[in-house]
């Protein structure tokens, strides 16, 4: 089915392009551009930003997931649900850590009325259903090992997209490396317009190994 995409930018000019689905469309700060895309077959279609936009431009990849209508409706129904409070003690400790360290930029639906409410709305991805995705960190890292298996169309190793949280092989090592030192994995962009020692991107929070284990245990519950 045809899908209309609203394309915006928060910072500089980007260009949205999924070659198999349509032509390019610029993302310009302060404007909304529309682009109609349509996939003829279910699958995962790769794209790339085609406008030089900064230090990580070459790594600004995109993936569009096309599903059958019934699978899409099931995905939407799940995405509209709030995150559930974890029962596992380690995951519960991870939620407490998330509330103290991560909600400045990230949000999780159902965890937005806590004492440490998000201070920068929309500054970073909403993580309510993190584990239903195939990538993170702007599409740079694969959440599951199957994400690069198979042919160039990304068949996810034969696993249906909606089944990744239950059947996929979670790449825990890469997520731990990301939480341990994000700027070492993906350089931060300078942002001299804000009164902060940090640039744009995820800073190093200097988490201990125990804290990383707790945070990963919590993030794994976000399905």
Where are these regions (language model features)?
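Residues that flank catalytic or metal-binding motifs in active/ligand-binding sites
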Residues: 1, 12, 31, 58-60, ...
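Short beta-strand edge segments in extracellular beta-sheet folds
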Residues: 63-69
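C-terminal capping alpha-helices of c-type cytochrome domains
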Residues: 71-80, 173-185, 194-223
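Extracytoplasmic beta-sandwich strand-turn segments characteristic of Greek-key/jelly-roll folds
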Residues: 20-41, 73-84
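Beta-strand cores of secreted/periplasmic/IMS beta-sandwich domains, seen most often
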Residues: 1-16, 34-48
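Electrostatic cytochrome c docking/interface patches
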Residues: 70-99, 113-115, 123
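Periplasmic/extracellular electron-transfer cofactor-ligation site
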Residues: 6, 15, 46, 50-59, ...
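Soluble non-cytosolic domains of exported or imported proteins
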Residues: 7-10, 88, 92, 96, ...
């Amino acid at each position: 089915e045809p899908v209309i995409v609203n394309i915006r930018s928060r910072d500089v000019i980007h260009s949205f392009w999924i070659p198999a689905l349509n032509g390019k469309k610029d993302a310009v700060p302060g404007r909304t551009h529309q682009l109609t895309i349509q996939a003829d077959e279910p699958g995962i279609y790769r794209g790339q930003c085609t406008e030089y936009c900064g230090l990580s431009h070459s790594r600004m990849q995109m993936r569009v997931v096309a599903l059958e209508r019934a699978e899409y409706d099931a995905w939407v129904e799940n995405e509209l649900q709030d995150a559930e409070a974890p029962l596992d003690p380690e995951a519960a400790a991870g939620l407490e850590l998330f509330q103290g360290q991560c909600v400045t930029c990230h949000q999780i639906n159902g965890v937005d009325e806590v004492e440490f409410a998000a201070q920068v709305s929309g500054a970073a991805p909403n993580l309510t259903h993190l584990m239903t995705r195939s990538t993170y960190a702007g599409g740079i890292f694969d959440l599951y090992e199957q994400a690069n298996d198979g042919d160039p169309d990304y068949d996810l190793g034969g696993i249906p997209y909606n089944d990744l949280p239950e059947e996929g092989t979670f790449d825990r090592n890469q997520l731990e490396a990301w939480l341990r030192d994000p700027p070492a994995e993906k350089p931060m962009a300078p942002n001299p317009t804000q009164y902060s020692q940090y640039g744009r991107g995820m800073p190093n929070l200097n988490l201990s190994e125990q804290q990383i284990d707790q945070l990963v245990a919590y993030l794994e519950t976000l399905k």
